[in-house]
């Protein structure tokens, strides 16, 4: 079975895209990241989240920049801490996006 990690349903969450198995929208996850939440803190505070779901939310935001423009820095990366290289190990290639999922190198 393949899980669609980001789901959009007009009858759920007013149609706002959300992470499968949670009541957290992509916007909620981006708000957490931009306020300084790391992946480990998100997973600790929201045990219903999954590593893959958070990465999919970031990737979804990257594909829908116009909808989530407030969360992008001037260099085009998502604001806030992303995945470290170690946290990104094991993610599928489509989610290993520098600046979007993986925090940019200084």
Locate predicted features.
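Short, Lys/Arg-enriched N-terminal segment that forms or immediately precedes the first helix
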Residues: 3-18
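Long, charge-rich, low-complexity alpha-helical segments
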Residues: 24-106
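Anion-recognition interface
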Residues: 21
